[in-house]
């Protein structure tokens, strides 16, 4: 499946300029995994295909793509804090910056996931408020209608 957003879009939507994240830091495979893990189970394959065709550009630009970018950022955080090389795995640090603690990383990741989920919930609310406008969306396929996780608890 094609990605809804590019590494360039992830860099511009989910990271601040001072984060110094380049498109080389963002693997398209990570975006694809995030899209399959977080977006497809909510919106469904047919809706994703419609978004890829350019249908519903307003919905994609305002809610779905920013959510995908933030989910991608959250999934990238451990990889950004650690580097894998011939010598093994090492923590990123330099003389000017200290690496974040595990607690700080967890807190930032949780906050980023919450922002992404809020955007995706807004997209779903907009879609479900006008079902005739979005015929590709099948609410029965939305996993949030069957299972929800709030604060790490399955509801």
Model-predicted segments: where are they?
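Eukaryote-specific, cytoplasm-facing alpha-helical/coiled-coil scaffolding segments in long proteins
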Residues: 94-105
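Conserved short "hinge" loops at termini or chain/domain junctions
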Residues: 1-65, 79-87, 91-92, 115, ...
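Amphipathic alpha-helical coiled-coil segments
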Residues: 103-123
């Amino acid at each position: 499946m094609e990605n809804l957003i590019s590494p360039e879009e992830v860099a511009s939507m989910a990271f601040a300029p001072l984060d110094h994240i380049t498109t080389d830091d963002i693997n398209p495979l990570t975006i694809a995994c995030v899209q399959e893990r977080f977006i497809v189970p909510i919106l469904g394959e047919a809706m994703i295909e419609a978004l890829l065709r350019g249908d519903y550009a307003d919905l994609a630009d305002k809610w779905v793509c920013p959510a995908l970018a933030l989910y991608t950022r959250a999934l990238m955080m451990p990889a950004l804090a650690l580097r894998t090389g011939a010598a093994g795995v090492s923590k990123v640090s330099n003389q000017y910056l200290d690496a974040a603690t595990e607690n700080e990383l967890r807190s930032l990741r949780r906050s980023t996931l919450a922002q992404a989920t809020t955007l995706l919930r807004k997209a779903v609310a907009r879609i479900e408020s006008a079902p005739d406008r979005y015929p590709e969306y099948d609410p029965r396929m939305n996993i949030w209608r069957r299972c929800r996780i709030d604060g790490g608890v399955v509801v």
